[in-house]
Amino acid sequence: MIHFRKHHTNLLHSFIPDFIPYLKALFHNRVYMLFICITVLQFSAFNGIMTFMPKYLEQQFGKSASDAIFSIGIYNLPVVCIGYFFGGLFMKKFKTNTFQAANIAFWISLSGYLLYFSTYWTICDASPVAGLTVSYEGREHVSYTENTLLAGCNNDCNCALKIWDPVCGDNGVTYVSPCLAGCKASTGTGKHMVFENCTCIAASGFSSQNVSAILGQCDKEENCDKMLHYYLILSLVCSFIFSLSATPGYMVLIRSLKPEEKSLGVGIHGLASRVFAGIPSPIYFGALIDTTCLKWGTKSCGGEGACRMYDIVTYRWLYLGLPALLRGVSYIPSVFILLILKKKLKSSESKVLMNPPVEMQTKEEENESLK
């Protein structure tokens, strides 16, 4: 036991003097540190998108959670694997230098980034919700408080304002609950329940001869399924391009390190990407998305539950805009890496021209002796 402790202490004492110089060398490696900045920014954007994509598909296109997750698995995950494979195959075949690899990664990634902006046009408007997105008279408004859920048509009903039990009126408007729709009677049971004599539907500014409502939110626009397919196809292409650029980018990381620094450098790179991107990005993405919530649910114990209704326009701009901002900033250190590598390449080429290889010098001497 004593021998083991001495051996362990000796290893520790021999490790620390070697570790500090390597760590110092890594922190003074400009390409390596810039690459870590790029990774943190790009991975933060990617992690935020993938974490909240199921929720985005639910809110924007009206898909269920299971359908949203299934769609992501079908459209996004396979092409990421294919992109990594072809990226590695491409780099193996063409045997590029570090500057060429960085150039390829930059332009491929930039093309995917520009294509990403086309997702802003895959829009699906939600059905109006009385007291949240429109007034009970049918006028649009953006400000929301619990008082806006009350109107003259339901003021005398003593409705609970924190309950989320939506019903769809015959006028195409969703109401937070049958009580807030002013419904006086119901027929049927379970999913087939129909609420009748709904005073708020009758008093709304929408033309409707009926004053009944059914369980659930009203359906979204007819073009929502088409827009969903457009969004998923664009997401598929962007995911493929993103993964295609990853392999040449990783080659830049590896080649920027000396052989004795690679194991430590790769480890610190992985640690930084998880500590500064993998952990915090879902937190601040979630906090920002929560600011777009219009109606919070209530737990059985009375506490605040999950968000039931979002302002989908603000949600869309935050969900798509924040990754665009992070990725856009990541191209600043990318440009600096290209400039540094280009300068190194020119410097090495000038040295070769000034000091030709030994074989070339020997051949020139032989040619001189033959003359």
Language-model features: locations:
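Disordered extramembrane loops and terminal tails of multipass alpha-helical membrane proteins
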Residues: M1-R30, T39, F52-P54, E58-Q60, ...
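An acidic-aromatic substrate-binding cleft motif
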Residues: M33
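Active-site-proximal flexible loops/turns
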Residues: I36
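Conserved, compact domain cores that house catalytic/ligand-binding motifs in diverse enzymes
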Residues: A272-S273
